[in-house]
Swiss-Prot record:
Belongs to the trimethylamine methyltransferase family. Catalyzes the transfer of a methyl group from trimethylamine to the corrinoid cofactor of MttC. It is an enzyme of class 2 (transferase). It catalyses: Co(I)-[trimethylamine-specific corrinoid protein] + trimethylamine + H(+) = methyl-Co(III)-[trimethylamine-specific corrinoid protein] + dimethylamine. Its EC number is 2.1.1.250. Keywords: Methanogenesis, Methyltransferase, Pyrrolysine, Transferase. GO terms for biological process: methanogenesis; methylation. This is Trimethylamine methyltransferase MttB. It comes from Methanosarcina barkeri (strain Fusaro / DSM 804). One of its GO terms (molecular function) is trimethylamine methyltransferase activity. The gene is mttB. Pathway: One-carbon metabolism; methanogenesis from trimethylamine.
Length: 495
């Protein structure tokens, strides 16, 4: 069995912890959700999924496609769903464990449609293309605080020309040795994804099932709908042993109640309906409890992700997932800023810290700007620094005989300093030590070129893209994997 990577993830609940709810409040959300799952129920558009629900005791209305899910099935599904599973990387040092109550991990945002590029001290936005996915994957492979890779942007140059989602599967796998999480899968193409992973394992389907280097995300449609695509991703993921992330994107005041507690009820109903479907399909199927839920800005007509409400909702979802014994995957490190600026730094720190202190198992949002529309590689490396600072805050202040340091205080005495102590020298890395954030005095900073953070981040991006080496895939195996993409392209073009 793979061991938890000591670098990947960070213990949340041993230092500073944020508890938003009492046990009674969590139960109240749960019982309200059980009412909603029976009245009005969930509209399930996929006939196969409706049949699975029906065969397992759900009331199904074939005229309206509404499924009513009784509480006993929810409880059964929660008992069957694993509280722990491994996300395998191509390089085993990048294996990460998703475990309820376990470590906190970070991954990049997905899926944007534009890139914010830093050119000659200015920012420009352009449509994202397949090469951007490859470059971001390489950058994430380097970033020590990005634990696995989620699809960050769309390959818009492939759209309408080939099997875009299949390209968006191989390109990340080939350009990072970390686990790949596909955020925009197509249900009818899941077999291609499975075959790509199987080809990586030399055609060994059982090995591909045991050690999934690939996982998928799907979103219910708020309020209270499971689309055909969402159902097929769940069903096929369960059957092929692919971990599946059921992630609600409710908007409070728009597609869910304006009250955040009410939004959590519809959110919970949507996610639990998907988890029940997975467990009815294959008992023990690996699932996340996911969230990209936020508020709807009634004045501006947007869904802000750099808001305190998003941070609170993500923190709340982490606690709901723990209540159910499930690993969680929540939005965080989010910003509505258009470029890597002061607003981005403020919003990303706030929306990262809240779910981290609640023990979310994965927080996704690194590199994201403009309400989730745009991705910036410079922002990604800045976020990598922010995560290191958040990890330090999560530790709190440990109190022990060693850290109370009475002997050191007595040894140094009155009016002296602790710089010369062997203990101080040995713990030179004990304080936070960001890579990019500047802590020099003004004169030293000016002498070094007076570079702002975005410039420093851009230089780091260029350095990584030029010099970082990703663990390669064997050429013959990569050829077999590419052949599956080519096959998907031919099918797309009707050839």
């Amino acid at each position: 069995m793979a061991k938890n990577n000591a670098v990947a993830g960070f213990n949340a609940l041993n230092g500073v912890e944020l508890n938003l709810f009492t046990t009674d409040e969590l139960k109240a959300i749960h019982y309200a959700t059980m009412e909603v799952l029976m009245d009005p129920g969930i509209q399930v558009s996929d006939p196969e999924a409706r049949q699975i629900f029906k065969e397992n005791g759900c009331e199904v209305d074939e005229k309206t496609n509404v499924v009513k899910i009784p509480e006993y099935l929810v409880r059964k599904a929660l008992q069957l769903a694993p509280s722990r599973f491994i996300l395998w990387g191509r390089d085993k040092k990048f294996n990460t464990v998703q475990e309820c109550g376990g470590k906190v991990h970070w991954t990049c945002f997905g899926t944007g449609v534009k890139m914010c590029k830093y050119q000659d001290g200015k920012y420009v936005t352009v449509d994202s293309v397949e090469k951007d996915i490859a470059d971001i994957a390489k950058l994430c492979d380097w970033a020590e605080n990005i634990d696995y890779f989620s699809l960050p942007v769309s390959a818009r140059d492939i759209a309408g020309q080939g099997a875009q989602d299949v390209h968006e599967t191989l390109t990340p796998i080939a350009n990072t040795a970390k686990h790949f999480h596909h955020i925009d899968p197509v249900g009818e193409n899941v077999e291609y994804y499975r075959d790509i992973v199987k080809a990586y394992y030399g055609g060994d389907e059982e090995e591909a099932r045991k050690k999934p280097i690939f996982s998928m995300l799907l979103c219910p449609t708020s309020p209270l709908e499971l689309s055909v695509n969402a159902c097929q991703v769940i069903i096929k993921g369960a059957r092929y042993g692919i971990p599946v992330n059921v992630l609600s994107m409710a908007m409070s005041g728009g597609s869910s109640p304006v009250y955040l507690a009410g939004t959590l009820v519809t959110h919970n109903a949507e996610v639990l309906s998907g988890i029940v479907l997975a467990q009815l399909t294959v008992p023990g199927a690996k699932v996340w409890y996911g969230s990209s839920t936020t508020t709807f800005d009634l004045k501006k007509g947007t869904a802000p992700v750099g808001s305190p409400e998003l941070g609170l909702i993500s923190a709340a979802v982490a606690k709901l997932a723990q209540f159910y014994g499930l690993p969680s995957y929540v939005a965080g490190s989010o910003s509505d800023a258009k470029v890597p600026d002061d607003q981005a730094g403020h919003e990303k720190t706030m929306t990262t810290l809240l779910p981290a202190l609640s023990g979310a198992n994965t927080i996704y949002g690194a590199g994201m700007l403009e309400l989730g529309m745009t991705f910036s590689m410079e922002q990604l490396v800045i976020d990598n620094d922010i995560f290191s600072m958040v990890k330090k805050a999560m530790k709190g202040i440990p109190v022990s005989e060693e850290t109370l340091a009475v002997e050191s205080i007595q040894k140094v005495g009155i009016g002296n300093n602790f710089l010369a102590l062997k203990q101080t020298r040995q713990l030179v890395d004990y304080p936070s030590n960001p890579m990019l954030l500047d802590r020099h005095m003004f004169g030293d900073w000016a002498a070094a070129g007076s570079k702002d953070l975005a410039t420093v981040a851009h230089e780091k991006v260029e350095d990584v893209l030029k010099n970082h080496q990703v663990t390669p895939i064997d050429a013959d195996i990569l050829k077999d994997m590419q052949a599956i993409v080519d096959k998907a392209d031919k099918a797309f073009r009707g050839m």
